[in-house]
Structures are given as structure tokens and as C-alpha cells.
Amino acid sequence: MLGDGNEGISTIPGFNQIQFEGFCRFIDQGLTEELYKFPKIEDTDQEIEFQLFVETYQLVEPLIKERDAVYESLTYSSELYVSAGLIWKNSRDMQEQTIFIGNIPLMNSLGTSIVNGIYRIVINQILQSPGIYYRSELDHNGISVYTGTIISDWGGRSELEIDRKARIWARVSRKQKISILVLSSAMGLNLREILENVCYPEIFLSFLSDKERKKIGSKENAILEFYQQFACVSGDPVFSESLCKELQKKFFQQRCELGRIGRRNMNRRLNLDIPQNNTFLLPRDILAAADHLIGLKFGMGALDDMNHLKNKRIRSVADLLQDQFGLALVRLENVVRGTICGAIRHKLIPTPQNLVTSTPLTTTYESFFGLHPLSQVLDRTNPLTQIVHGRKLSYLGPGGLTGRTASFRIRDIHPSHYGRICPIDTSEGINVGLIGSLAIHARIGHWGSLESPFYEISERSTGVRMLYLSPGRDEYYMVAAGNSLALNRDIQEEQVVPARYRQEFLTIAWEQVHLRSIFPFQYFSIGASLIPFIEHNDANRALMSSNMQRQAVPLSRSEKCIVGTGLERQAALDSGALAIAEREGRVVYTNTDKILLAGNGDILSIPLVIYQRSNKNTCMHQKLQVPRGKCIKKGQILADGAATVGGELALGKNVLVAYMPWEGYNSEDAVLISERLVYEDIYTSFHIRKYEIQTHVTSQGPEKVTNEIPHLEAHLLRNLDKNGIVMLGSWVETGDILVGKLTPQVVKESSYAPEDRLLRAILGIQVSTSKETCLKLPIGGRGRVIDVRWIQKRGGSSYNPETIRVYISQKREIKVGDKVAGRHGNKGIISKILPRQDMPYLQDGRSVDMVFNPLGVPSRMNVGQIFECSLGLAGSLLDRHYRIAPFDERYEQEASRKLVFSELYEASKQTANPWVFEPEYPGKSRIFDGRTGNPFEQPVIIGKPYILKLIHQVDDKIHGRSSGHYALVTQQPLRGRAKQGGQRVGEMEVWALEGFGVAHILQEMLTYKSDHIRARQEVLGTTIIGGTIPNPEDAPESFRLLVRELRSLALELNHFLVSEKNFQINRKEA
């Protein structure tokens, strides 16, 4: 809870609130809105009428639990039931039944849905808000051309433009444009009504020629002219009803439906008073837009900033789910209409239940969650990742932008983002600036705008009132920046503070301020606000840090950070990783998998997560924190989760670090570490991998799971039980059988081996006709079997095969090639693990755990790591933890440096270690070489920063290939570890080998090991029988491919081979 004095007090909102509120809004409002749109359906003879009674719909609570849905690959959904009636008009009889419409996937309290056993999350999308926008562009003559763009609710665009002669045109496509008079006339106005409803009738009359008068003489002529231009039809089309319907469908419905938000924006921009329920573009809108365009031409009015957030809207999870529900009801309407007609045709008596099927709704939502670009698999690497993922904002997706066409201006930070979209946290690469993150206090308003809270400062009232303002409203206030205001002291009236007014940043006196920010870093996202001393870092490095914190692996023994920002507890609470008491009571029983809580006369069982696999193969595990018999209050923490300690987020470890070069082993961001981190399991993490196999019913019979697998060595089957499935607790190595399976196959007599035929002829022994298709442990999968799941098929259909899943836990210590990072964008790869006696050591004898390169700090400008490093050392010596809000320079100049030095000085006094703070070089100390015992020449910065181990681990990346698959076209090895591929020797690698003069190695690289088919086969034969490998003679396959591709362009390329022996030239055909 945060406050300014005792007046303005606010709590940080729940980090999952955006997603959860959106889903609740869909259930409360969106469902009924779409159900009310469902029309009454009649048969062709209009004898039977079908309709839904929306008032009595109900959602049924799911029968399965979330955890079971994940393990059994099911969808955690609720069944939707609606009352429907079938009315016979002749007899006025009505049959009413409650029918099952379909399943709607539910959202849990963390803002995620479970679809087919997979956690999925729907990302909020930023779109251009429907309405009209005016802008100015220079033509090829350097003259300003003013245009007004009308954007519909579905994203369709139409433009109005004014030329040098003040003529106004409506551009309905890129090439075609028509007069504004023709468009208005086609929409139903005559010339007199047009002139009466505009402010500048003389300008409209000035470009009205005789030809133009003829076009707008009647509505039919105007529609024909409009259709001819819009559809690019040559000749003279004839007016008809079908022509009007086509025009209505292709133009007016797609480009003229403004929607609720568009109507509001249009009324505000053009000062209209058209009712909100009139959501289509009217002739009055067109004429008012044309008047405004003429005003701009003559210097009146203002242009629009398309990138301002007041001109954007958020398409939340509620809107997306409502759109899909409406689409499903349209499909259901078509099904019901066809079923009624079919029943009447076959003289059957229909009932509401017979007419309705649940397939449209269920399949629509399954395809939405599975295929829609804004529905993503939830990233569950660590608790922080889960809550950050749901707060993303994307410009991409249907109706949005693409990574290749978005301009720099759209990607850039805008002043209206203040307090709404984080200026730091975005993705790296092609989508930079297109995928952002919500600021901590931001919320989605009623009209789809992003709102940010402010404290109102009024002379009349002594209290402080909190307001949520949309992007367009806070422009007209003087807003004091929160990073310049103290949290717990009164602001002096004569103080001069930085403020924001109309997208400009000013410095004004305190009495001129209207609003103030409520929190020093309310304009940061969760990831960025977990970075201590972020104000001392370059923004690019802060961006990397906020991304890399989401890649941190939960460690087996987590540790709180000594230096933090204070948001660690809130992040852990909202992540769902903790087990929290839902009510008061007393703990009567505890176990590793559940807690029993007694209170209010009954007992509540709280299950715990035990060695659960995330979709990034990290281990999610809860550790009990309350003893048996303890009295618990509501909201108290019962168990810590993965990467949490004491209810706070704990992604890494506080380790002793020195910034110094060491024999070149930490150059170019490499990191030197001590073996203590390995042997004491400092950076040890557990990873759980899932392996699965299915049993099908083939045309030759069902596949069989058994432990009797012929022709396999016994030690590969040693871990199987009597059913042929690996036993729990077994230690398995690469190549071991996890599930024994035999697939039946038809074998001809001629395909039997001679010894098999002999056994059948003499002894009558039946030789196996099954093929071994066992599940084997792949390379790098060694570990302990912790769980086995046999999911039986439902309904007995061969399309629903049985699935056997085996979960194997791996213990991974830190090793050379793993990636580690700090919280300031300082990342590196482990280059060498030194014995602890060889590491540099301090004056008290402690050896350093990590050695970083000091050259990685000044050029990257992330000095915050130095402050954290030194303050962490003081905290470890004083046994203190610090929670520091960013921008502490609001209290005084050099506040961060003074805090660090004062804490180091105090630590030096209390521990009687003068080397902790030496006035000649504060923060540095003289340390000693562990190999020689001699001190290093220069004092070195030492400290205890918080270092994370990232998920980019060498065990998942290391790869070697001796033989493997080849591409069919180029005959070169495939690419990638998953395909057992090889490394490409490119042009620069060839130059390097040429520079060393290694001709034979270079020839091997370009022929045997690459795409020379004949040479590859000769190598294999020569290796088996022995002898010298012959040199390849003809051209490799890639050259032959080039010749064939040139032939497709009608270019013939002849090539010749020159013999090494007699220099004879032989022509070769490709």
C-alpha cells in the first residue's frame, strides 16, 4: 500500500485483473448481447418458427478439475444451456425445451484457459479506433494535401481528400475516386439537401458541372455512377435490386459500420449529436467531414496524431470472445435453418433439441484458441513469466499491423503512453515496439481506452482524490511527474517540479499543478519495475533485463534478492505459484501433497503442486511453510512455489562477484565461475520432460503394449513392469525402453530370413510378425521417472487412441555453456569453472563466486549493476534486505551513491573490516590471486548482485552429427538440432580454410560431408572393406541443381571435367 502522507492511499491492482475482468465482462454482457441478436428462424412455408429465450440461459460448473484437464488433454469448459421454443403458426402451439448450445472454455483466476490440456492466454490487441482522422501530406510539387480517413469498426478505410481547386473527392479504393456529391446522392440526399447541410455551399457549387448534375439528378444515377467507379465496371450498367445488394454488402456494410465506439468518436470530432445507437455512417457524417476538410484547407482546425493513444482502442479478451460467440451463432443459425427445411421435406416432426447441435460453438472456440494469432500458449518458465504474458499488448494480429510493414513512427514511444504502456518493456527483433506491456496501474476503460490514475490537487479540498483518466483527457491538465515527488513527505509550495502538459514536458511551480502521479514508477511494467536502480541504466539494457527475467529458471534452492524494488511480493502473490489460505482456520494435517484446514465447522483440503512440469520443462513445486496445529488467517501463505521464498519472487541467487579480467576467460561477455556453485548446488535446477506414445488400431489389428520385445537386449528392458511400461522411480539412460510396443504387420513368405523359414518348416515355430515400435529415451534425456500416466480412450473409437505419458526429472547443475544474467542487461556464457582455491579471494579469505568483465559496464551504460553489487555486499554483511523504489534522486542529489556508501561504511564499522569501505577507492577492494597468493595490481569492485540462471542451457543446445538425413532437392544435410542436422560451411568459412591451405579438409567439407551423392556412397564402402577413399570426380548435386534451375530460365550451362592424369577434357551432362 502506497500513500502520500495520510491522504492519498492506493493499492497496486491485481496483475491478472485485466484478463479476468475482460472474461467476466464477456460472461455478464457479451453473451446476452449476442444471444439477443439471434433471429427468429422460419421454414420456407412460414409455418414453423424457431426462437431462443435468452433470459433463461445458464452455464454449468465443469465436472472435472483444472489439474485433471491438463493431465488428460481435455478442455476446461462450461456447458451453455438456453431455452428454445418451436412455434407452429397454424395451431399456435409452442414446444419449449432447454437445449445444449455448446462448450465455452472457462478462465481461471490467473487469466488463463485450458484447451486440450494446454494453458492458453489471449493477448490484448491495440487497433486504430474507428472514426475520422485528418492528416496532411506533401505531394510531388511540395504542396500540402489534406485528407480525412474514415475507419470502420471492422478496419475498412475510406478517404476524403481536397485538391488544389478545393474540390472534394471520396476515395473508395487506391485508384478510384468519386465526387463527394455523387457519394452523398448515392446515400439518399438530393442537391438541395446537400447544400442545406453544409457550411460552405458555394464551394460545393463551384465544382458542380453539367455532367456532375446529370450524375446526381436521381439516386439511381448516383448509385450507378458509384457502382461503376467502385467495382471498376466498363460500359453502362443497368440499375437493379441485385446491384444495390452487392453495393450494400461490399461497401456499406464493410466500410460504413462505425460501431458504438466509432459513433462516439465521430460525434466528438465533428461536433455532431447523432444518437449512439445509430452505428452506421450517415450522409450527415460525410458532409460534416467535408466541411471540416475545407476548414483545414483554409487554416482552420487541427490535424490528428494517428499514434496518440486517444485514437487507439484496446480489443480485449471480452471483445475477441464475443466476436467468436457471434460467429458461432451465425453458423448455428445456418444449421437450424437447414435442419428445419430438411425435417419439413421428409415430413418429420422437429423438436428444439433435434434442430440444434453443439458443434458450431464448440469447434469455433477450439479453432479460435488453437489457431488465432492472439491466442498463445502460456509461457510458464517461472512465476513472473505467467503474469507478464497476460499483460502484453500487441499491434499485430487480424486487422492490425505486420512486423515487416510497420513504420518507425508507430514503434516509437509516444507521450500519451505515460502511465499506460511501458516505455521499456517490448520484444527484441522484428516486433520491437509492436508488442508492449501494460503499465502497473493501467486499466482498460469502458470505451476500450487505456486509463491511468492520478491524484487531483485542488485548493478548495484538503483531501486527495484519485481519478482514472483516458489519454485524451489528461492533456489539458498540468501533471506533475511521479518520479520527482517524495512518497512520504509533504511537497513544499515553492518547490519547482517537472510536469507534463499537452504532450510537452515543462518545469513549473508546485501551485500550478493540477494532477500528480500516484506512484514513482507507475509508467513501468512489472518486469521493468523489478529492476533496482533502473534510473542509472540505459533503456536498451533495461529492456534486455525485463525480457531476461522472464527466462530465469526456478532453482532447487531459491533465495531472496538482497536489493529489490518492493514489488517482489505482489508479483509472487498474483502469479498463482503460492498456496494461500482462502479462509481462517487451524492446520490439522499436512503432507507433501495437501493441507487440511479446519474452520467454521468443516475441513477444507488444499492440494499442493508436486513436481509438475511446465510447458518449458521447468519444475513447478510447492514447499510447505506452516506447521501442523498453527492457526491461520485468511490470505496467509501456506506454501511457497517455484522461484518464491517467504512469499516473495526469488528468481536467482546472491553470489560474490568481482569485476576484473582473468586470463582472457571473461572477455566478450564470458563469465568465469567457481566450482562451489556446482558442488553446493547453488545454481542447480530440476527439469521435467514429457515423453508420450499412442497405441492405435491398425488394419492388421491393435498395437500391443508389452514387456516381451523380441530381438532387443535385456538391459534395455530392465526398467519395464509386467505391462511393458517403465516403473516409477527408475533411473533411465539414453536408448532405454520407456514403453514396449509391438505393431502388427503383414509379412510375405519370401521376406523371411533363411533361418526363420527353417524354423517354421522343421519345428513349426511361429516367427513374430510384429514390428517393434517402442518408445525409447532420446539423446540427452537421462533422469529419474517421476510419473507415468495411461490415458484410456473414450468411446472405444480407433480415432481416440490410448496415450501413455512418461515424465522424467533431470537434475542440472550449472556448467560451461550455460547462460547467466543480472537484472541490468548484463548477460554472459559460462566459459570456465575454476577450482575454488584458484579463484581470486578477498582479504577475509572468502573466494569469489563469479568474475565479470569490467569492460561490459561503461560502453553499455548500465551502471545500476555497480550500485546493486556494492549495496548487496553491505546487505550480506549487515544481514539486511533493501527495497528501493527507483528515481531516489527525488529526495536529494546523488541519493543512490550516498545510500550505497553509507551502508558500506556501516558494514565496515560493524564487521571491523576496513577493506569493505576504503575512502581512497570506495566500493573497491584489493583482492588476491588464488593461484599465487599475490594481490592484484589494481583494486577491484566486489559485491553481491542478484544473478539469474537462464533457460538457454547447453544441454538443450549441444549437438553433433556423424550421419543423418539429407534434403531431397539439394542433397545437403538438414538444418537444426531437432532434425539431427549439420552445420553449413558458408562462403566465409571456405575463405578461412583456404587461408590456412587445408585443401583436403576443404574438399571433404564441400563434397563427402555435403552433397556429393556418389562420393558419399564410396566413402561408406571404402570404410567397410578398407583402403583409400577415392577423390570425387564429377560435380556435386548443388551445382547440378543450379544447372537445372538455369534451364528453367531457358539458359543452357555446359560444364567440363579436366582429368588430373592426362588433362583430357570430358563433357558432363547435368
Swiss-Prot record:
GO molecular function term, any single one: DNA binding
The protein's Enzyme Commission number: 2.7.7.6
Enumerate the InterPro entries for this protein.
DNA-dir_RNA_pol_bsu_ext_1_sf, DNA-dir_RNA_pol_su2, DNA-dir_RNAP_su2_dom, DNA-dir_RNAP_su2_hyb_sf, RNA_pol_bsu_bac, RNA_pol_bsu_CS, RNA_pol_Rpb2_2, RNA_pol_Rpb2_2_sf
Task: Provide one Gene Ontology biological process annotation.
Answer: DNA-templated transcription
Q: Does the keyword Transmembrane apply?
A: no
Lineage, opening ranks: Eukaryota, Viridiplantae, Streptophyta, Embryophyta, Tracheophyta
Question: Which HAMAP family does the entry link to?
Answer: RNApol_bact_RpoB
How is this protein named in the record? DNA-directed RNA polymerase subunit beta
Q: Which reaction does it catalyse?
A: RNA(n) + a ribonucleoside 5'-triphosphate = RNA(n+1) + diphosphate
Source species of the chain: Atropa belladonna
User: GO CC annotation: what is one?
Assistant: mitochondrion
